[in-house]
Structures are given as C-alpha cells and as structure tokens.
C-alpha cells in the first residue's frame, strides 16, 4: 500500500457509544486501522468494554500526548466533550456522525471507510482552526473556577424559570444591563447551536467574533450583540438575584457562583483543530442541516 501521503502514524478513537451499533463501529474501525499499519489508541472506557489489549487503552490526556489525530465517533456532544480536553494538546479531530445534526462531525457513517481512506491514505483533507471561550469565576479578587467552551458559555440561574438582573461590561466598559433568564455568550462554532435557538445570528467559523444573545429578556428592545472576538466580557449581578447561579459550558460543564461573584468570558489560548475532508463546504453543511434547499 502506498503510504506517501500519510500524515499520521498514531490515531486515537474517542467517544462515548450510546448503543451497540456505535460500539461496534469503534471495534470495526479499530481493526480497520490496525490492518493498515497504524498505531491505534482507544479511549479507556471503550477499550475496556471491547476487551482490547492493554497497550491500546488511553485516557484523553494520554491521547493528547501520544496521538497525531483523534477520530470522534458520535454526535456533536461527543465532539464537544473531547474537543475541550484535546484542544490544549494541538491535536486535530475529525468526527464520524452518529448523532442528530452533526455540525461538527463531517463523516457519513455509511461512507466512513472510503472517506477515511481518502483522508488518511491520500491526504485529501485540510485543517481548520476554531477558537474556544474561557469562562472564569472571580470571587473576592481571586479566580475560583474556570472552564473552556467550544460552543457557548451560558449564564443562568440554577433553577429554571427564574429571571436575573445583571450588567455586561466589554473591555471593562459598561455595555448594557438586562433582566432576563440569562445570557448566551457564543463562539462562531456555537452560533448554530443553543444561540441559534434563542434567535442569535449565524457566524461563519472564520469570523473573529463573539455573539451575546439574551435569553427571554424582559425588554422588547433587547437584541443579540456581536462583538470583536478578542473582547473581554465581564458580567456583574444585582444583590437581589437568587443565590444559586451558574455558568454552563457547552451544556456539559457547570460553574456555580453567587451574585457577589463576577463572571469573565474571553477567547481561550487554546484552539480546536478540525480536520475536514477536501470537499468540505460550510455552506453545504448549513443548507443540509437547516433545510436551506434550492428552489429553482
């Protein structure tokens, strides 16, 4: 076999299978890669379930240090969870879509092996970088908790259907005050996720921009605001707010805080590196996922 175009020697399989079909795909792909001479690592929990030899077991951190590519099997949720961890290791990710929409998972499971062969064996791919957000909780002038987010950081009360009052500062300058169910702070990657459902704008992935999208604001003039991607966003809260507030990162990580704390959100120093097939077209993804069909 011609290995002229091979860019990767060690490839990791990651994801959390929801059913036997997804688990079987992990197993099949493991053997497919092994047969082609790749060194293969498999996320620890899956490898144990599949009873793979010990040398193939690896945590996400070990994968970050040892692998040159991670293949995510699952939906966007699986991609988000792995991307937050692996971004700091500068390892590219490509996804096989086993979820619903699949904005971040390019590969069609029906054509997975032919598409992977084009990518891995013939070098028919390119790498796209996308920025992450970093959310921090400041308490008494000290940072007490932090998390990255690929899609969005959402400020909201711990209990549903509770409104909160807050002020938003951009680069330490007052921008606006709001009474609402919360605020979505979204990356361009996240603009087609929760932000879109809340009426936020779609931002193409190459934009250096952050969207601030209110959640059920108690003011008809409240509208989404798009700011420079290098902005530092700070949110301060009224004392009469409920004592249990949260920042949700990609709906997977929760940072609790109180009205006395300050939430800071800005671009993370780490970037998500997405590996795309050569014929990838972002606008085709939008039209297929959102039903933007040609009328003539």
Swiss-Prot record:
<dbReference type="InterPro" id="IPR017437">
    <property type="entry name" value="ATP-NAD_kinase_PpnK-typ_C"/>
</dbReference>
<feature type="binding site">
    <location>
        <position position="181"/>
    </location>
    <ligand>
        <name>NAD(+)</name>
    </ligand>
</feature>
<keyword id="KW-0520">NAD</keyword>
<keyword id="KW-0808">Transferase</keyword>
<dbReference type="GO" id="GO:0006741">
    <property type="term" value="P:NADP biosynthetic process"/>
</dbReference>
<feature type="binding site">
    <location>
        <position position="252"/>
    </location>
    <ligand>
        <name>NAD(+)</name>
    </ligand>
</feature>
<comment type="function">
    <text>Involved in the regulation of the intracellular balance of NAD and NADP, and is a key enzyme in the biosynthesis of NADP. Catalyzes specifically the phosphorylation on 2'-hydroxyl of the adenosine moiety of NAD to yield NADP.</text>
</comment>
<keyword id="KW-0521">NADP</keyword>
<dbReference type="Pfam" id="PF01513">
    <property type="entry name" value="NAD_kinase"/>
</dbReference>
<dbReference type="InterPro" id="IPR017438">
    <property type="entry name" value="ATP-NAD_kinase_N"/>
</dbReference>
<dbReference type="GO" id="GO:0003951">
    <property type="term" value="F:NAD+ kinase activity"/>
</dbReference>
<keyword id="KW-0067">ATP-binding</keyword>
<keyword id="KW-0547">Nucleotide-binding</keyword>
<dbReference type="GO" id="GO:0019674">
    <property type="term" value="P:NAD metabolic process"/>
</dbReference>
<feature type="binding site">
    <location>
        <begin position="151"/>
        <end position="152"/>
    </location>
    <ligand>
        <name>NAD(+)</name>
    </ligand>
</feature>
<dbReference type="GO" id="GO:0046872">
    <property type="term" value="F:metal ion binding"/>
</dbReference>
<feature type="binding site">
    <location>
        <begin position="192"/>
        <end position="197"/>
    </location>
    <ligand>
        <name>NAD(+)</name>
    </ligand>
</feature>
<comment type="similarity">
    <text>Belongs to the NAD kinase family.</text>
</comment>
<dbReference type="InterPro" id="IPR002504">
    <property type="entry name" value="NADK"/>
</dbReference>
<keyword id="KW-0418">Kinase</keyword>
<protein>
    <recommendedName>
        <fullName>NAD kinase</fullName>
        <ecNumber>2.7.1.23</ecNumber>
    </recommendedName>
</protein>
<dbReference type="GO" id="GO:0005737">
    <property type="term" value="C:cytoplasm"/>
</dbReference>
<feature type="binding site">
    <location>
        <position position="179"/>
    </location>
    <ligand>
        <name>NAD(+)</name>
    </ligand>
</feature>
<feature type="binding site">
    <location>
        <position position="162"/>
    </location>
    <ligand>
        <name>NAD(+)</name>
    </ligand>
</feature>
<dbReference type="GO" id="GO:0005524">
    <property type="term" value="F:ATP binding"/>
</dbReference>
<dbReference type="GO" id="GO:0051287">
    <property type="term" value="F:NAD binding"/>
</dbReference>
<keyword id="KW-0963">Cytoplasm</keyword>
<feature type="active site" description="Proton acceptor">
    <location>
        <position position="76"/>
    </location>
</feature>
<feature type="binding site">
    <location>
        <begin position="76"/>
        <end position="77"/>
    </location>
    <ligand>
        <name>NAD(+)</name>
    </ligand>
</feature>
<dbReference type="Pfam" id="PF20143">
    <property type="entry name" value="NAD_kinase_C"/>
</dbReference>
<dbReference type="InterPro" id="IPR016064">
    <property type="entry name" value="NAD/diacylglycerol_kinase_sf"/>
</dbReference>
């Amino acid at each position: 076999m011609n290995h002229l175009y091979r860019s990767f020697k060690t490839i990791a399989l990651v994801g959390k299978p929801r059913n036997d079909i997804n688990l079987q795909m992990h197993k099949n792909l493991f053997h497919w890669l092994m047969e082609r001479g790749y060194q293969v690592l498999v996320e620890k929990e899956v490898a144990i379930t599949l009873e793979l030899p010990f040398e193939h077991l690896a945590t996400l951190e070990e994968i970050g240090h040892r692998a040159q590519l991670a293949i995510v099997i699952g939906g966007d949720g699986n991609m988000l969870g792995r991307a937050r961890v692996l971004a700091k290791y500068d390892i590219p990710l490509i996804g096989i879509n086993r979820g619903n929409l699949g904005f971040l998972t390019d590969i069609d499971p029906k054509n997975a092996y032919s598409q992977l062969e084009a990518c891995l064996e013939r070098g028919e791919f390119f790498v796209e970088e996308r920025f992450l957000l970093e959310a921090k909780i400041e308490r008494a002038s000290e940072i007490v908790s932090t998390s990255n987010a690929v899609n969005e950081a959402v400020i909201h009360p711990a209990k549903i259907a509770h409104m909160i009052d807050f002020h938003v500062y951009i680069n330490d300058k007052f921008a606006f005050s709001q009474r609402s169910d919360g605020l979505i702070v979204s990356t361009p990657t996240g603009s087609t996720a929760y932000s879109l459902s809340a009426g936020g704008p779609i931002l193409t992935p190459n934009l250096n921009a952050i969207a601030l999208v209110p959640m059920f604001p108690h003011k008809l003039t409240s509208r989404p605001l798009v700011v420079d991607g290098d902005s530092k966003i700070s949110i301060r809260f009224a004392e009469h707010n409920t004592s249990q507030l949260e920042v949700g990162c990609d709906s997977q990580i929760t940072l609790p805080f109180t009205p006395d704390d300050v939430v800071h959100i800005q671009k993370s120093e780490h970037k998500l590196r997405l590996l795309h097939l050569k014929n990838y077209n972002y606008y085709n993804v939008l039209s297929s996922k959102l039903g933007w069909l040609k009328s003539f």
